[in-house]
């Protein structure tokens, strides 16, 4: 889960607080620096548009014109990470000055890249060393929480989220992503009661956020509770993001759970077109099965095996394919397989 960063204070305030001079701040003092800044801004725009290769060219020109530019180093690192060249990405993240305006972002990006290259222990060891130097910056704690979540260590992830909340003196609007992401960790860690409270708190700040509406609505549907409200929430999310395959999957699965299997098939077929995901394809197979289209259902279950299904899901799929078990009907459905 990657959400907007929460800064207890900006890097500029950190520099002032520690009485440090940012010797590498991008000061436009001559024509060469000015041209470098133009190329850097253009590179940032291209990168945000997903044009990585073009962005790389512009960022390299910017760095050539203004050597030792931390902003250029940081952007080059992000670009190389985006094109899966993690080794080069690390080289650039490491070049960022200790008291630069992008220091914290570069440190976090470095930790995330180390995770991809060497795993959890290396990344958390790096972060432990860094966060002790910046005890007031909760973004380091949040990154720890996210990395443990990514490693399926939900208990440890929750511990870091709890530590973050203890450090926040006053809850504000900007903290809503923390309630959302910690809610997901709690839900995955089988602590639904606390998770639900986190989602509901997030909704108090962002009542129409499609991510929160979808996750909470899907969870309610899956548990067979608050069905009508959950369906309204997912419909709201789907209207906002009609091209989000995961949200459309939630809508299809909601119809499945209330026994509207034909409506489920329509939406799940659309979801599969938008994103190839083993869980979504499995959902489609189940909906087809209860719509009386059993041959098509088996085809979809077999297809789901081709899309990086977890070991648990593989067992479920194989049992359904071999006829050793049947899919479960919707939790609030009264219809039976046709």
Which sequence ranges carry the predicted segments?
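Canonical tetratricopeptide repeat
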Residues: 12, 16, 41, 75, ...
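Residue-level recognition of tetratricopeptide repeat
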Residues: 44, 78, 112, 146, ...
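TPR alpha-solenoid repeat register
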Residues: 9-13, 72, 106, 140, ...
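Structural marker of alpha-solenoid helical repeat scaffolds
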Residues: 3-6, 65, 98-100, 132-134, ...
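TPR-adjacent "capping" and linker segments in tetratricopeptide-repeat scaffold/adaptor proteins
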Residues: 23-38, 169-176
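Register position in tetratricopeptide repeats
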Residues: 48, 82, 116-117, 150, ...
């Amino acid at each position: 889960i990657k959400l907007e960063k929460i800064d207890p204070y900006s890097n500029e305030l950190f520099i002032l607080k520690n009485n440090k001079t940012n010797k590498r701040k991008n000061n436009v003092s001559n024509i060469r620096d000015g041209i470098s800044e133009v190329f850097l801004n253009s590179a940032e725009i291209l990168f945000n548009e997903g044009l990585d290769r073009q962005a790389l060219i512009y960022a390299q020109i910017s760095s050539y014109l203004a050597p030792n530019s931390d902003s250029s180093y940081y952007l080059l690192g992000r670009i190389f990470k985006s094109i899966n060249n993690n080794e080069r990405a690390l080289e650039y993240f490491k070049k960022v000055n200790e008291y630069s305006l992008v220091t914290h972002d570069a440190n976090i990006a470095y930790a995330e890249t180390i995770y991809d290259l060497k795993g959890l222990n290396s990344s958390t060891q790096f972060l432990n060393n860094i966060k002790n130097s910046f005890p007031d910056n909760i973004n380091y704690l949040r990154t720890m929480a996210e990395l443990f979540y990514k490693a399926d260590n939900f208990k440890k992830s929750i511990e870091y989220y709890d530590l973050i909340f203890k450090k926040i003196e006053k809850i504000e609007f900007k903290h809503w992503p923390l309630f959302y992401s910690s809610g997901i960790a709690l839900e995955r860690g089988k602590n639904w009661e606390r998770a639900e409270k986190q989602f509901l708190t997030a909704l108090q700040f962002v009542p129409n956020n499609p991510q929160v509406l979808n996750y909470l609505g899907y969870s309610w549907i899956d548990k067979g509770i608050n069905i009508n409200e959950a369906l309204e929430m997912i419909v709201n999310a789907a209207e906002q993001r009609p091209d989000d395959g995961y949200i459309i999957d939630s809508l299809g699965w909601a119809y499945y759970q209330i026994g509207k299997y034909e409506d489920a098939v329509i939406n799940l077929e659309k979801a599969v077109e938008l994103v190839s995901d083993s869980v979504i394809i499995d959902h489609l197979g189940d909906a087809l099965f209860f719509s009386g289209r059993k041959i098509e259902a088996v085809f979809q279950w077999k297809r789901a095996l081709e899309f990086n299904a977890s070991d648990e899901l593989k067992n479920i799929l194989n049992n359904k394919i071999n006829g050793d078990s049947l899919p479960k009907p919707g939790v609030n459905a009264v219809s039976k397989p046709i």
